[in-house]
């Protein structure tokens, strides 16, 4: 009725349902504190799987071939920028330049069973030349989990993955950006940590490098997913 009146239609009738017609709200638009608490609690329980890529993209470095040493399925804590942990990740990455203790605590809580069940003995992280925010988080998380944090990757300057036009460019960019430090030798199962997952090529390449150095299994973990397709 309100919209019809705005259009100057004189032939309007009361619907008998909306506030404009009956003079009051049939259902309250005020969100109770209890409902808000339940909504936040629900969002905090959202965990996304990081399904492993099993095939290389066709690039200037490789054909479209099978990845012979893929990652195991990993875990993503939140959806980037969304209420709850997703907001904390965004704030830590771009505002405070440090991920808060709540993210460390929650991550440790999420990962403890995986660490125990899979016998994960070390934590490796994806380095960045722009910031040490992931390194700092990884060190604190490893301490909370009671496993060593290892610094095994070398990173060279490159474009950001989100600036790449398609999967082939993202794959090529990641493969050219990362390498292992000289003499790196690994064994057992490793937790691979990054802050944000999108195309999964960074985690795929870094996980593959860990496998080539002797790691038996690599389990990715990311604080947030920024992909419209989510982490799967």
Where on the chain are the PLM-derived regions?
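Acidic, divalent-metal-coordinating active-site segment for phosphoryl/phosphodiester hydrolysis
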Residues: 194-206
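Active-site signature of alpha/beta-hydrolase-fold catalytic machinery across serine-
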Residues: 136, 140, 205-209
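Glycine-rich phosphate-binding loops at beta-strand->alpha-helix junctions
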Residues: 125-134
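Active-site-facing substrate-recognition patch
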Residues: 33-122, 135, 139, 153-189, ...
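Residues at the starts of beta-strands that form the adenosine-phosphate
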Residues: 148-149, 189, 216-219
């Amino acid at each position: 009725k309100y919209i019809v009146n705005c259009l100057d239609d004189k032939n309007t009738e009361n619907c008998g349902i909306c506030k404009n017609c009956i003079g009051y709200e049939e259902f309250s638009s005020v969100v109770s504190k209890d409902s808000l608490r339940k909504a936040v609690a629900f969002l905090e329980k959202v965990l996304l799987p990081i399904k492993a890529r099993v095939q290389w993209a066709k690039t200037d470095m490789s054909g479209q071939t099978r990845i012979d040493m893929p990652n195991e399925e990993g875990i993503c804590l939140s959806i980037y920028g969304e209420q709850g942990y997703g907001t904390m990740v965004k704030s830590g990455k771009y505002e405070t330049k440090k991920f808060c203790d709540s993210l460390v605590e929650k991550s440790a809580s999420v990962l403890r069973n995986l660490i125990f069940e899979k016998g994960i003995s070390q934590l490796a992280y994806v380095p960045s030349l722009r910031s040490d925010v992931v390194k700092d988080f990884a060190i604190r998380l490893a301490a909370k989990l009671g496993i060593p944090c290892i610094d095994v990757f070398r990173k060279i300057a490159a474009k950001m993955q989100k600036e790449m036009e398609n999967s082939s460019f993202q794959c090529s960019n990641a493969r050219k950006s990362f390498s292992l430090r000289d003499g790196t030798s690994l064994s057992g199962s490793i937790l691979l940590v990054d802050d944000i997952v999108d195309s999964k090529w960074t985690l795929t390449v870094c996980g593959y490098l860990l496998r080539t150095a002797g790691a038996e299994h690599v389990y990715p973990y990311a604080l947030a997913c920024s992909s419209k397709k989510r982490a799967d």
